[in-house]
Amino acid sequence: MPIDDAERERRRALLHAHYDVENAHDLDRIMATFSTDAEMLYNRQSFGDPKSIRTAHAYIGLSSTGGAFRGIRNVIDREHFTTDEIVVEGRLCGRHVGEFQGHSATERDVELPFVAFYRFGADGKLTSERVVMDLGRLAERA
């Protein structure tokens, strides 16, 4: 059954609130967007509890202490709505300054394209975040 305009706008607002706090690098506020039983999948790696979800966000660089990327921001290029999810085509942008998923730091500014699938509960909290990101640009050397 297709979603109505009100539900589409509710989900869009929740998604943009999540991206806003990610781009502000505020881990506490990022975690406040997740339900306590949420699951995050990143390139098929599962993070099934709040502690591991928090650690994964910090590892990437979405915290005030930094991580594999500096000056990181997630950019939404397109949004698509299904009955249950929002599908985002986007880019992670930042300087690759630390090891990430087996790729040593390149010290280059990169844009990594991704597709992400978000599911929100009735309470407005994320219950599922699944991200598939193309890391090929990290293997390229200048």
Predicted segments with their positions:
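Generic hydrophobic alpha-helical segments
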Residues: 17-18
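Short, surface-exposed loop/helix-turn segments at secondary-structure junctions
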Residues: 98-107
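Basic/polar N-terminal segments that are highly enriched at the extreme N-terminus
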Residues: 1-13, 142
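Short glycine-/acidic-enriched loop or helix-start segments at secondary-structure transitions
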Residues: 50, 98-99, 138-141
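A solvent-exposed, acidic/Ser-Thr-rich amphipathic alpha-helical stretch
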Residues: 8-12, 27-86, 91, 95
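Short beta-strand edge/turn micro-motifs at domain boundaries
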Residues: 85-87, 109-140
